[in-house]
A protein has these predicted regions:
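Internal metal/ion-chelating core segments
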Residues: 1-54
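Glycine-centered flexibility motif
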Residues: 1-4, 23, 52, 62-63, ...
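ATP-dependent carboxylate/phosphate-activation module, predominantly the ATP-grasp catalytic core
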Residues: 2, 40-104, 136-164
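A long amphipathic alpha-helix within ATP-dependent nucleotide-binding catalytic cores
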Residues: 8-31, 61-128, 164-192
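Generic structural hydrophobic/aromatic packing signal, biased to beta-strands
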Residues: 26, 38, 51, 117-119, ...
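Functionally constrained cores in energy, signaling, and assembly domains
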Residues: 36, 40, 108, 121, ...
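C-terminal active-site "lid" helix and adjoining low-complexity regulatory extension at the edge
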Residues: 138-139, 143-209
Length: 209
């Protein structure tokens, strides 16, 4: 939508009952977007917290889709993550995700073993740089395999403090699989066609970088 008139025309098509039942979400359209993932995953007494970026790829039908995530994971919680060196945009994304996450404290007894927040950063229609959380995911998602790979690495080596892990989704028959990757799927998908999905730990440090 490019203006208020288009928005009004769209809203006129919706009934009040639909809005009351399903709600209405409006998002700012951004150009030159970077999508960042920030979150926390806990299994048993083991917790990691992470930040990273998502990858966009072209699928077998010519559409731009999610192609995986590159995560930097720390052992522990938000405080440990914030000790890592990171650029200004990444630090803002972590701050915004943590603010969003803090609101779960308003719901006594709330528990989510995975809390992932997607933050969009880009240029709006007026040429201004914007950043904000546009999705919260408290279920398994595209980056979950990278999170699990980091958890496993931390479990296998108690001295590790930082793990960088990547989840990858590649379309087509020309694919590259790096050494040490765990392959989840490498075949023809009935809907997506030739598809490769794998996860790999790319770096592990015994102290913060």
């Amino acid at each position: 939508m490019t203006g208020v008139a288009e928005l009004d025309a769209f809203l006129e098509k919706l009934s009040l009952e639909e809005i009351e039942c399903h709600g209405l979400v409006l998002e700012t359209n951004l150009c030159r977007v970077t999508t960042r993932s920030v979150g926390q995953t806990m299994i048993g007494d083991r917790m990691i917290t992470y930040h990273g970026t998502q990858r966009a790829v072209t699928n077998n039908h010519g559409s731009t889709v999610y192609g995986g995530s590159d995560l930097i994971c720390v052992r522990g919680g938000w405080t440990e993550l914030e000790k890592l060196p990171m650029d200004t945009q990444a630090r803002l994304a972590v701050s915004q995700a943590r603010t969003y996450d803090r609101n779960t404290d308003r719901y006594p007894g709330f528990l989510a073993s995975r809390r992932n927040y997607d933050i969009g950063q880009g240029i709006d229609g007026r040429g201004r740089w914007r950043s904000g959380v546009f999705e919260a995911s408290w279920r398994s998602g595209g980056a979950s395999t990278a999170e699990l790979a980091a958890l496993m690495a931390f479990a296998e080596d108690p001295a590790l403090q930082v793990v960088e892990a990547t989840s990858v989704k590649q379309f087509g028959r020309r694919t590259t699989i790096p050494r040490g990757a765990v392959i989840h799927f490498h075949d023809d998908d009935p809907e997506d066609g030739p598809l490769l999905r794998y996860t790999v730990v790319t770096r592990a440090l015994r102290r913060a970088a």
